[in-house]
A protein has these predicted regions:
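Perimembrane helix-loop junctions in membrane proteins
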Residues: 41-48, 92, 96, 143, ...
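Cytoplasmic juxtamembrane interface segments
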Residues: 1-18, 90, 158-181
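Secretory targeting signals
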Residues: 34-39, 58-76, 115-180
Length: 181
């Protein structure tokens, strides 16, 4: 496989993705959701301390895991964001007719799919960076932060987002209609 062609397809796909307002709106909505969830968890911890109770659990584990942990809450809603990104990946090529140009060019179908998936990997990294921002605040405010727990949570969220992206990419190859994909 020619890596330059794959990266060119990925760069073009990212440019098309960021020219549309959908990607920007999803990033803003995801950032707001992460911020609200972070503040809810922080409020619960402050309430426990204000009542005079001692925190018997690891603050890092309570922040990251648990029933109200930030990764748990984001994991429950991340599936709503990914289909809005992946529905255009291949169906746009089918509906505009540019798939015929791609097939006639010296690019294999595997390179097309891998290039589009690489663009989704970059977008998933942006999601993970946004999700990592509250951990920076945690490093400042929480003593004895368990870094392995945080990194494992971020890695699991990254892999979950990539799983949803691969499912979305597969679904968009089946039809030329964006809504169906």
């Amino acid at each position: 496989m020619n890596l330059r062609l794959i990266l060119r397809i990925a760069r073009t796909e990212l440019a098309v993705l960021f020219y549309s307002p959908v990607a920007w709106l999803l990033l803003v909505a995801f950032t707001c959701q992460v911020g609200f969830d972070f503040m809810n968890i922080l409020t619960e911890i402050v309430k426990i301390k204000a009542l005079g109770n001692t925190i018997t659990f690891s603050v890092t584990a309570g922040f990251v895991l648990g029933l109200k942990g930030i990764y748990e809450v984001i994991q429950e809603t991340i599936y709503l964001y990914i289909p809005l990104l992946t529905m255009n990946l291949m169906s746009r090529e089918y509906s505009s007719g540019s798939i015929k140009l791609l097939y006639s060019s010296p690019v294999s179908s595997v390179q097309i799919i891998v290039g589009k998936f690489v663009s989704m990997v970059v977008f998933a990294l942006i999601f993970v960076v946004i999700l990592a921002l509250p951990t920076i605040v945690m490093f400042i405010s929480v003593p004895h932060v368990d870094i392995t727990l945080i990194l494992a949570g971020l890695l699991s969220m990254f892999l979950l987002i990539l799983t949803y992206c691969s499912i979305g990419l597969f679904m968009t190859t089946l039809t030329s209609y964006q809504v169906v994909a």
